[in-house]
Swiss-Prot record:
Species: Pyrococcus abyssi (strain GE5 / Orsay)
Assembly: Consists of a catalytic RNA component and at least 4-5 protein subunits.
Enzyme Commission no: 3.1.26.5
Family: Belongs to the eukaryotic/archaeal RNase P protein component 1 family.
Gene3D superfamilies the record matches: Ribonuclease P/MRP, subunit p29
One GO term (biological process): tRNA 5'-leader removal
GO molecular function: ribonuclease P activity; RNA binding
This protein's name: Ribonuclease P protein component 1
Cellular component annotations (GO), alphabetically ordered: cytoplasm; ribonuclease P complex
């Protein structure tokens, strides 16, 4: 550990260069009872973080078969943690989400593109 010259405070190194590495391989994920029921009709507006997901089909063959839990979501990517960490683009994949009651919901990634808070405002056609 190095010292800061002027203020004489201890400096520690920055955070991990690989985020989410500390939870790789764990079988649990935080799932509170406050979560609403996820159904096929409301999954577009629902929070995806914490749901179990599997990539069923993709334009890129390297993404097919990835499965784990969603730990982060950006506008165009899902961060999935299973036995390692993957950043999967939403628009080129078809995802299969598993709900708490064991139901499996397939949804094309194009329907999920956008920030989670902006998806609430967007109007969707029935599908």
């Amino acid at each position: 550990m190095r010292r800061n010259g002027k203020e004489r405070k201890d400096r520690t190194s920055g955070g991990s260069q690989r985020p989410y590495q500390e939870i790789v391989g764990r079988t649990w994920i935080f799932r509170g009872s406050h979560r609403g029921r996820v159904t096929k009709r409301n999954i577009i507006w629902h929070e995806l973080i914490g749901l179990k997901v599997r990539v069923v089909n993709s334009m890129h063959p390297g993404f097919v078969g990835i499965e784990g839990y969603v730990v982060d979501e950006t506008r165009n990517m899902l961060v999935i943690v299973g036995d390692k960490v993957w950043k999967v683009p939403k628009d080129v994949c078809i995802f299969e989400f598993e709900t708490e009651d064991g139901a499996k919901i397939k949804i094309p990634g194009e329907r999920l593109v956008g920030r989670p808070e902006m998806r609430l405002k967007k109007r969707w056609r029935k599908w």
